[in-house]
């Protein structure tokens, strides 16, 4: 690890396309002539300009364009009315760039025009109200017409720049462009120009998060080098990877119509001639219950594990028995990657997720249960865990229907203590929900995604609600870091084949995960306070990190025998658990912790979460098969 000293208090970064490194805070990469008022948020070099033209955005809401060879500011744009958070450029358009600011606008700049004003490309306030803030943006490296935008809330937006421009051009050229009736409404964006992505469990959790003053905001978005994946660091939550090629809707509850229970078809094992309806995962949950699939599909027999994977599964089972939930999850994930058609592995991993109970774990457990059922519709434990997951995710009516379905499929379990306990929980929740709706009156209805505000400042338009309901779900989730203190925290792809994911954290560390297994492989201390920025070198195995400390650290591989001067965090699981507690802590406690105060339960070890949800499962145990 090398260290570059910087004399200011916060550093942002830019790694140029050719691979040279440059860092700045008030542009220490250049002379003081381009120093700015306020905290510098972002800078980018204009492509194909010989590293001569530098674009800067700052908290003073201004966007400046500097010529480094003549040491002059050649353009200054003051169109934004709030802090500029990010600048984006595209190699295909060497004279064009974009900015995202906290006024909710995405602006486009064309340096070939003489105008000193920019064009509003996307106005998020037309969709989400006046309080929305744009936080980050990036252009797809393989398709420069594709722009990703992160803003307030859990949704990440992809826009087709070319479609937007063509739509506005056709509107201007239309003979009736200036003639509108009273009922006309001009859409700011054409149909098909926007696509939303969201972690499927987050929309329904928003009311609870808001009540606890927990803010969700996309602090960084970036595409993979191939342009087929989108990585999002979700402030207040986890890091998510979205597959842009094989898209999937948020998982819904869809169950086979019939499944004959017998001693041979339980807990992930079934006879080789078993045939039943399959399970689909392509649609949203609806508040009026779940829909059963109409088509029939062939179910493959249970795949036997090779000896080495059987050993991995046994190690995972042992970790589960010792209540080492994270270790069990990582071992099951390792096995799932090698044997993706084994229902038992998904069912076991779901049980570990349900026991650990970190943010998003019950939704991942739901996904695993559905996958297990799709591979084996007669997987007893997966059916029961599915009902429990739906209950924990606040889909109470669906949980009741799922539990009834479970009792019908497995009548010998219908009166077990586990079923009775879950049934009582669901009944109590339904009564509580009905009482709450009666108190709120007839105007308080609506599904979990269609959340409408009574305030005009943060009202959500009909177009926005449609786009949200058409959103796609994530492929992978990465846990362990904490992202609650700053709104510029990055996550990035790393490795020769982008096989790793890296992210900064509020505890001064940065985390490295395997992309495909989502397993945490290394935690390194990168700052005394917070790691915000992580940028990989485009052609060498270098990683640049920065945060609050007045230094930029450059990381590259070292011999195993070489001392890393205490930078390696040995207790990765303990650090991850502490960060999960920090994310769920009271905001005042987090502020005091960041100021140096010691808060009991936040800065010390221990799993922190009770495991009483499955204590009364009776015959339907949540232990792995």
Where are these regions (language model features)?
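Terminal intrinsically disordered, low-complexity extensions flanking WD-repeat/beta-propeller proteins
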Residues: 2-18, 154, 164-230, 235-240, ...
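Conserved beta-strand element within WD40/beta-propeller blades
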Residues: 20, 54-58, 97-101, 147-151, ...
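WD40-repeat beta-propellers
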Residues: 32, 57, 63-68, 87, ...
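Short coil/turn segments within WD40 beta-propeller repeats
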Residues: 41, 59-64, 82, 103-107, ...
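Loop/turn segments within WD40 beta-propeller blades
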Residues: 44-51, 88-95, 138-144, 222-227, ...
